Amino acid sequence: MNSDELNAGWRLTLPSSVRRHAIQAMRLKDGDELQLSDGRGLRIHAVLRDAQQGIAEVLRFGKEPQPVTRLALVQALAKTGHDEQAIDMATQIGVDQVIPWQADRSIAKWKAGRTDKKWRQVLESATEQSRRSWTPQLDDCVTSKQVVAICKRACVHGDMVIVLHQDATKTWEQLETGIAKLSDTCLKDGRPRTIYVLVGPEGGISDAEVEAFTKAGAEVCVLGSNILRASTAGPVALSLLARALGRFV
């Protein structure tokens, strides 16, 4: 729904999934307020008028802009659902773009028309749960060669690519100056830029991939002394970035 088509006082029929979430998960009753979103920036503040029928009345609404400094997760395919866990948590944290990656050591395989549907459902569900107004953009699955191209484009556009690797010598603290500089530049000129976080599969990123990404301009760093799972490394890095960018205020 377009914000131009809305007015305060209008009554809306909630989609069945939203109605179930409001009644069963949130335990809302008639007269309780709730927030709705179309996943494209429109946020609606409403009051539930008929919980059983899913009827809500619009109180106010507005369009929320996307952040100037965008966060993207390049997540390698991982077995036993670790990749889906990663994008779920990343969405709750505030990731703006998700790029599936068929890494050299990925055991799981991307199945067009099936895996992308599952990932999209995860993103939409996490968006709804976290009350976000924007659903993260889901890109097509990329190969390692295409990730190299992403790194090269990032260098040209003034973006940043951070590769998480357990054997890296550079620490996250050493990247913070560059992160702050990129954020300040975005605020000054208003031109959107993206910070990409790249996470490998269970078997890690191959030496050949690390070398190729580094030559293409990516920063390779380690997140502390503990080895993180494929499901947690990305969300941890995104949390640090969100805090550095002032999203956690």
Segments and roles (model prediction):
Residues 207-249:
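Structured adenosyl-cofactor binding patch, chiefly the S-adenosyl-L-methionine
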Residues 158-212, 218-222:
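Active-site/ligand-binding-proximal alpha/beta "capping" segment
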Residues 65-163:
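RNA substrate-binding interface of SAM-dependent RNA methyltransferases
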Residues 3-4, 16-17, 39, 77, ...:
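Fold-independent oxyanion-binding glycine-rich loops
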